[in-house]
Amino acid sequence: MSGLCFKGLARWAALLCSGLVIGLGVANSDADASFRIKEDSFSISNAPGYCFAMVAFARWYYLSRQGQPSLRKVLSPAAQLRIARELQEFYSQNLIKLQADYCNVHHANPSESFRRFLLGLLSGEPQIVLLMNRGSSGGAAVLHAVLAYEWLPERNVLKVYDPNYTRDERFIDLDKKWYTSLDITYNAICFPEVLNAHPALVRRMEYLYSRYVHRIGDQRLAGPIVRPTAPWQQSN
């Protein structure tokens, strides 16, 4: 699976951002979804390698909760671990090829892919970002997923939730050629919007939410009957 190198993306960013902001009538060019790492992300470690599941579920719940408490208040660490494990398995079995095909196609047209990515951020929706690196020995690509929630155009920087860091804001500097998470450096990037609201993925997250809800004593903060309704599912 190929992705756009950071150097190639950086030259599109400055050209696109000012035009998008003007076109949308946004006064402040900083795109901030108000996502908060210490509230809206998983509190568990990504040590088992569940990064995609963690960012996808955090995004879905953040956009769908409609007044419910934040993710860390709703789901216990044990429930978070079960959700992350089962959702990562679903992703690995059902969505890897879709993701690879999308990133390969849009590798040839980075400006349009990045434009849609920025439109999502400017509308207040965190966006899934895939990071890739192929080892010097030519082995299989190493993949990592983060969730972008704020765009700082004057610095050409994305603020992201990186599941390897449970309490810290992280930054992807698009002017650089790489991003390092723990001890792995990534040098290619993809914005897989095809996965943001994939119907099968959404259904799986709804199911896992209703199954592994956090309990305080006998009282549920939310339950299988009170499922979040995504904004795109609401009637006007």
Regions found by a protein language model. Give the residues of each.
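Active-site-adjacent substructure of cysteine-protease-like catalytic cores
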Residues: 106-160
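N-terminal secretory signal peptides that target proteins for export/translocation
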Residues: 1-8
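Bacterial N-terminal signal peptides
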Residues: 13-24
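Cys-His-centered catalytic/binding microenvironment captured across papain-like cysteine peptidases
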Residues: 138-143, 152-236
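Cysteine-nucleophile protease catalytic domains, especially the papain-like/related folds used
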Residues: 34-112
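Boundary at the C-terminal end of the N-terminal hydrophobic targeting segment
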Residues: 27-33
